Amino acid sequence: MENEDREIIYDVEKENGLSAGGLEELMKQWQAKLQMDDWNLSLKVVEFKRKNGYRQSGDFVAIPENKQATILMTSNPWRGDEEYTLVHEMIHILFYEYDKSNEALLLKNFEKFSADHEKYMDTLEELVHHMTRIILGRSDR
């Protein structure tokens, strides 16, 4: 998901938290648990640079028609729960086609980044957070 207010720097070294290999192993475990074995998933460690200073934990790039996706994880996690971020991004991937279809319908009537569009995006994010907590069996976020 590209965004005009940020830059993504690829091919960076992991600064702290789980190693890139540890994240990949965790991704494979969750890929099986989430029944995403038909997806070709990869993981990249990146640095997110945002104009507003927001510290982003993760993101993804997906081609749902090919069932391919790359999960982007920050090189310098600060929340201490990379598993949560990883599963959160995987849930986004599962919802991505549905999300894009609904967003396209919304954008026929509303401007991108309008209050209505932002409400849609906020609601989507809350849904993904809620599903992530349920799947992980957590109530701490």
Which functions belong to the PLM regions below?
Residues 2-81, 97-141:
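Metalloprotease/metallohydrolase-associated module, dominated by Zn2+-dependent proteases
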Residues 84-97:
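Active-site recognition of the HExxH zinc-binding catalytic motif
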